[in-house]
Design a protein with these regions (language model features):
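Local sequence-structure signature of Cys/Sec-based thiol-disulfide redox active-site neighborhoods
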Residues: 58-92
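"Short basic amphipathic alpha-helical interaction patches in structured regions
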Residues: 79-88, 98-101, 112-114, 141
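Non-catalytic, surface beta->alpha helical segment in thiol-disulfide oxidoreductase systems
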Residues: 122, 127-155
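Extracytoplasmic/secreted cell-surface and envelope-processing proteins
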Residues: 77, 110-111, 136
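Thioredoxin-like thiol-disulfide oxidoreductase module
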Residues: 100-122, 128, 153-154
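N-terminal targeting signals for export/organelle localization
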Residues: 1-52
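Thiol-based oxidoreductase modules, predominantly thioredoxin-like and allied folds used
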Residues: 66-72, 95-110
Length: 155
């Protein structure tokens, strides 16, 4: 894991969410959570977002909220969520404006939460809000890059 004293709150928040599944009685759930957690730091550190796009995104930091529906078992989720966390961190988005909601392999919500109110097709389903209004989604993989797709949604 990243140094607990020197890493973004948004990453710590994800670690806390994944830790719930690490302690699951269901060994498959625990195994997928471990796989996700083990790769999270590497994906977060290695992703190099476009700095010019990040500079444009920073002006939206206080306007944006992101809710992600994902599955620990999903390779797209395990790749895109750490990258998204890095983009949000460099944008200056507060960790309390980021939420992650888990679904199982049949895409049923793990908890009775935001995911339960949505029709879930592909994951991750990244739902982007600007000033409390949903402005769009990035589903499964970005069209260009996470930061470019976010900028297009927030303009």
């Amino acid at each position: 894991m990243l140094d607990k004293n020197n890493h973004p709150d948004i990453v710590h928040k994800m670690e806390m969410i994944l830790a719930q599944d690490l302690n699951s009685d269901d060994s498959a759930t625990a195994d997928w959570a471990k796989t996700f957690m083990d790769g999270f730091e590497t994906e977060f550190k290695n992703y190099q977002p476009d700095r010019k796009v990040l500079d444009k995104l920073k002006k939206h930091a206080t306007e944006v909220e992101v809710k992600v529906i994902g599955g620990n078992w999903c390779s797209d989720t395990r790749r895109e969520v750490p990258r998204l966390c890095k983009v949000l961190y460099f944008m200056g988005v507060s960790a309390d404006k980021y939420s992650y909601f888990r679904v199982d392999k049949s895409k049923k919500p793990v908890d009775n939460d935001f995911a339960a109110s949505r029709t879930i097709g592909s994951v991750p389903d990244i739902v982007v809000y600007k000033n409390g209004v949903e402005v769009g989604r990035i589903i499964e993989t970005p069209r260009e890059s996470l930061e470019k797709d976010l900028l297009a949604l927030l303009k």
